[in-house]
C-alpha cells in the first residue's frame, strides 16, 4: 500500500513515512481513492480540420467529464486540408473559442490554450527580422599594396543585416575552388549537364536510382595540378537524424541513435588522379540526415591536402534496399583548396547533430588562419557595403559577415495565421509572439470570466539557429572573450589551431543553448507568471533540431513536459528527461504528452501498459495527444485529424466504458 500511495501521490514529491501520522495517511488514502480533478489526465483538443459547431463542443466536453478526463487544451493543429474550418481570429472563431471556454467551466474541466496557431511559436506578425537567425558571409580575395574601394559581395541572397567585416592574409593558392579555377566538368548521366551540380542555385539536380555497384561519375579536369583540402555539397536528406531525446535504449557507445534512425551508407567517394584513368580515394561523401523540419542540407568533408589534375565524385550504392526514395538530389558542389573544420555546419550550430570526435586533419600553421593577423575593417564599410581600405602587402581575404532569417516556419496551424517561427534567442521576438496570440486569447477570455488555466507549448521542429541581434554581447558576458575574431570559424575556417577552433565552437554552442533557455523559455515563463497562468512546455522537444540543453531548458519552465508515443514499442521516449529536470530543478509536475498517434486498433489495455512505463519513468501528469474535435453528432468515426486517428474521443466505441482507464491514471 505504501509504495502505491507514494507513486500515486507524486513522483516528484515522495511520501515521507517518518513524518506521517494517521491523519495524513487517511488524507492520502482519501486523495488516492477520490482523485482531485487536478490529478486527472488532460487532452490536447485539436481544432481546425473541420467546421465548428456549438453542439459538437458541448458533446465533446460533456463526454470528457463523464469519462473522467480532467481538462482540455484548445489547440489549432491541422494535418488535413481544413477546407471548412473557420479562419483563425475571425469573428466566428472568437465566438466558438469563448463558447468552448465557457462550456469547459460549466462542466468542470480545466481549460488551457496553446502558445501558437499550430506549433510551435510563430505567425504572420513575425517578420524576417524577428524570425530565427543564422550567420552568413561572403568572401573576396585581393592582392595587397593597393587602395581598395568597392562594394563587397552581399553575404545573403535576400534580406540580411551586417555584423562585421574582417580581413586576414592567406596565400591565394590556398583559397581556390572549382568556381575560381573553372575546370572542365563532365558526367556520365544522360540528359544532365554536369555544370548543374556545381552552379550556385537553390534547386538541386536529381540523380535517378542506379543498379547496385553502378556508379555515376562527375568529373573535374583542372588541366593543371590542383590541391584540395575540403569538399562542400548540398544533398537531399535521408532517413532520420540520430539526434533526438528519444534515443533507442542501448549500451553506451560513440554514437547514439534516435527513434526511426537508420544508418545510411556514404553517397560515394571523392577520388583523385594524375592521368584521368587510375583514381584513388580521397574521402567518403557523407549523407545528411533529416532533423525535425530542418531545411539545412549542406555538408563539408575535410581531408589532408591532396594534389592532382583530375578529381571525380564516384556516386554509387547510396541507399539501402527497400528505400522509399532511392534517387539522390545533389548540387552546389565546391571542391576547395581551403582548410576547413570537418562537418563545421554541425559544430557551428547551422544544423543540430550529435557532436562526435573532430575528424579535421592536423593542418600545418601555413594552412590555417593566424588569429593575430585578423584585421577588423567593420568601421571602414559604409551602409551600402562599400569598403575603402589601404591594403597591406600580400594576398588578403575579406569576409563580410551578416545574419539572415533561417526561414523556419510554424507548422500545422490554420492557414491564415501560419508564418515564420520567432527568434528563440530574442526577448523582443518571443514577447511579440506572446502579445499577438496567447495574450489576446487570455485577455479576451478573461473579459468574460473564463480566463484560461494555462498555456502549453509543443516541441520545436523548425530547424536550428546560431545568431540573434546582440549575440556578441551575450557571448562576451557569458564566456568572457570577444567572438568577432572567431567569426571565420563559424563559417568553417580554422582560426589559431584545430583545437582552439573546436574549443570556440563548443563555447558557441553552449552560449546558443544558454540564451535559448533564458531568453525563450525563461521569457515565456515570466510572461505566464505575469498573466497568472500555468506554463507547460516541451523545452525544447524530442527532435533536438536546434542547439539546446533540454534539461536546462526544461528547468526554466513551471511544468517540464516530455512525450511518449503509442507506436514506439522499443521505448524510445524522452519522458525521463522531463522527470529528471523536475528532480534537478525542484518542479512539482513532470508532464508527458501521452499516447501520441494512438490508433483505433489499439485497446485501452495496450495503452495502460504504456502508461505504466511512463509512470515508472516518474512523470506524474498526462496530456493526451490528441483528441480530435468532433463537430457532428451523427458521423462516425468523425474527424480523424487528417488521417492520424486521434482516437481518444467520444466517437470511439469503448469511450463510454473507459472511466476506469482514466481513473487509474488519476491515481
Feature-to-residue mapping (PLM):
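Aromatic, loop-rich ligand-recognition surfaces of beta-strand-rich domains
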Residues: 199-278, 295-370, 459
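Active-site-adjacent "subsite" loops/lids of carbohydrate-active enzymes
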Residues: 123-202, 290-296, 353-442, 472-512, ...
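Bacterial Sec-dependent N-terminal signal peptides
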Residues: 1-22
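N-terminal carbohydrate-binding accessory modules
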Residues: 15-39, 47, 55
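N-terminal cofactor/phosphate-binding cores enriched in small/glycine residues
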Residues: 50-85
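Acidic/histidine-rich, surface-exposed loop or edge segments in extracytoplasmic proteins
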Residues: 36-46, 76-83, 407-422
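Carbohydrate-binding surfaces of carbohydrate-active enzymes
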Residues: 21, 40, 57-58, 72, ...
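Solvent-exposed serine/threonine-rich low-complexity stretches and specific carbohydrate-binding patches
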Residues: 282-290
Amino acid at each position: 500500500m505504501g509504495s502505491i500511495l507514494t507513486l500515486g501521490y507524486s513522483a516528484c514529491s515522495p511520501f515521507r513515512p517518518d513524518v506521517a501520522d494517521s491523519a495524513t495517511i487517511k488524507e492520502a488514502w482519501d486523495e488516492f481513492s477520490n482523485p482531485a480533478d487536478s490529478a486527472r489526465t488532460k487532452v490536447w483538443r485539436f481544432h481546425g480540420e473541420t467546421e465548428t459547431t456549438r453542439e459538437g463542443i458541448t458533446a465533446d466536453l460533456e463526454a470528457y467529464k463523464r469519462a473522467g478526463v480532467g481538462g482540455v487544451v484548445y489547440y489549432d493543429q491541422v494535418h488535413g486540408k481544413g477546407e471548412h474550418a473557420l479562419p483563425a481570429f475571425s469573428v466566428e472563431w472568437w465566438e466558438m473559442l469563448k463558447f468552448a471556454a465557457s462550456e469547459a467551466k460549466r462542466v468542470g474541466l480545466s481549460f488551457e490554450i496553446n502558445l501558437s496557431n499550430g506549433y510551435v511559436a510563430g505567425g504572420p506578425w513575425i517578420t524576417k527580422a524577428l524570425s530565427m537567425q543564422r550567420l552568413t558571409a561572403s568572401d573576396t580575395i585581393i592582392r595587397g599594396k593597393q587602395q581598395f574601394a568597392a562594394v563587397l559581395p552581399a553575404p545573403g541572397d535576400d534580406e540580411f543585416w551586417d555584423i562585421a567585416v574582417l580581413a586576414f592574409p592567406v596565400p591565394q593558392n590556398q583559397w581556390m575552388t572549382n568556381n575560381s579555377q573553372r575546370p572542365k566538368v563532365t558526367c556520365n548521366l544522360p540528359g544532365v549537364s554536369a555544370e548543374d551540380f556545381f552552379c550556385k542555385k537553390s534547386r538541386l539536380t536529381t540523380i535517378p536510382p542506379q543498379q547496385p555497384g553502378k556508379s555515376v561519375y562527375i568529373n573535374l579536369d583542372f588541366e593543371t595540378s590542383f590541391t584540395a583540402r575540403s569538399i562542400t555539397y548540398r544533398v537531399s536528406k535521408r532517413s532520420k537524424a540520430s539526434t533526438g531525446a528519444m534515443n533507442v535504449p542501448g549500451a553506451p557507445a560513440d554514437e547514439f541513435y534516435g527513434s526511426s534512425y537508420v544508418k545510411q551508407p556514404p553517397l560515394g567517394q571523392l577520388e583523385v588522379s594524375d592521368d584521368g584513368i587510375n583514381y584513388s580515394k580521397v574521402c567518403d561523401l557523407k549523407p545528411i540526415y533529416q532533423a525535425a523540419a530542418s531545411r539545412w542540407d549542406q555538408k563539408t568533408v575535410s581531408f589532408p591536402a591532396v594534389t592532382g589534375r583530375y578529381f571525380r565524385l564516384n556516386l554509387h550504392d547510396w541507399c539501402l534496399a527497400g528505400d522509399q526514395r532511392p534517387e539522390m538530389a545533389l548540387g552546389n558542389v565546391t571542391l576547395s583548396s581551403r582548410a576547413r573544420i570537418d562537418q563545421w555546419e554541425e559544430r557551428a550550430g547551422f544544423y543540430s547533430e550529435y557532436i562526435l570526435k573532430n575528424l579535421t586533419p592536423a593542418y600545418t600553421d601555413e594552412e590555417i588562419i593566424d588569429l593575430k593577423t585578423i584585421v577588423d575593417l567593420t568601421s571602414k564599410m559604409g551602409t551600402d557595403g562599400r569598403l575603402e581600405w589601404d591594403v597591406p602587402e600580400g594576398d588578403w581575404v575579406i569576409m563580410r559577415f551578416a545574419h539572415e532569417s533561417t526561414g523556419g516556419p510554424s507548422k500545422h496551424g490554420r492557414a491564415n495565421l501560419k508564418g515564420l517561427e520567432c527568434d528563440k534567442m530574442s526577448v523582443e521576438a518571443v514577447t511579440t509572439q506572446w502579445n499577438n496570440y496567447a495574450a489576446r486569447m487570455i485577455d479576451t477570455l478573461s473579459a468574460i470570466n473564463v480566463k484560461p488555466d494555462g498555456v502549453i507549448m509543443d516541441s520545436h521542429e523548425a530547424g536550428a539557429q546560431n545568431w540573434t541581434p546582440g549575440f556578441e554581447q551575450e557571448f562576451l558576458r557569458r564566456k568572457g572573450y570577444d567572438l568577432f575574431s572567431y567569426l571565420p570559424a563559424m563559417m568553417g575556417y580554422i582560426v589559431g589551431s584545430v583545437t582552439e577552433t573546436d574549443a570556440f565552437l563548443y563555447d558557441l554552442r553552449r552560449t546558443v543553448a544558454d540564451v535559448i533557455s533564458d531568453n525563450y523559455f525563461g521569457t515565456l515563463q515570466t510572461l505566464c507568471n505575469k498573466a497568472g497562468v500555468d506554463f507547460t512546455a516541451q523545452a525544447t522537444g524530442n527532435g533536438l533540431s536546434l542547439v539546446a540543453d533540454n534539461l536546462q531548458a526544461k528547468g526554466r519552465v513551471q511544468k517540464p513536459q516530455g512525450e511518449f508515443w503509442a507506436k514506439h514499442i522499443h521505448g524510445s521516449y524522452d519522458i525521463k528527461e522531463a522527470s529528471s529536470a523536475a528532480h534537478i530543478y525542484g518542479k512539482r509536475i513532470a508532464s508527458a504528452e501521452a499516447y501520441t498517434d494512438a490508433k483505433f486498433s489499439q485497446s485501452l489495455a495496450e495503452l495502460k501498459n504504456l502508461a505504466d512505463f511512463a509512470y515508472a519513468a516518474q512523470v506524474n501528469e498526462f496530456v493526451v495527444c490528441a483528441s480530435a474535435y468532433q463537430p457532428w453528432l451523427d458521423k462516425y468515426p468523425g474527424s480523424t485529424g487528417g488521417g492520424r486517428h486521434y482516437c481518444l474521443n467520444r466517437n470511439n466505441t469503448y469511450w463510454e466504458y473507459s472511466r476506469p482507464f482514466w481513473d487509474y491514471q488519476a491515481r
